[in-house]
Amino acid sequence: MDQAPFDQQVTFLYTRDLATTVRFYEQVLGLSLVLDQGTCRIYRVSADGFLGFCQRAEAPERPAGIIVTLVTEDVDGWFARLRERGVAFEKAPALNPDYNIYHCFLRDPNGNLLEIQSFRDAAWPRKR
């Protein structure tokens, strides 16, 4: 491909309760707020990756078919920190040999499925 990759990436999700969402992503996950647009908040997940939440009365209660994957080499550390902060996990850290990943799962207050994962495959591009 002749065209360079995009500069940044933002994934937006809807929420019925922005205040609860803000508390979870700021106080529990510790993400930094980069832009407050009133009914939408955008958080930095990595150097060029962002996660945004917009208040919508019609937001689904438990969205299906979406997994927000947060990639880190320290899955166990994140698991321990979040458990200390009262987070209930759907799946404790484990190796998935089918995809050569190590991961765990939890849900945010909106029912979004979050995966904390590390790639074991040497072909995965590492942090720049």
Q: Each PLM stretch: what is its role?
A:
Residues 30-36, 89-93:
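Short secondary-structure junctions
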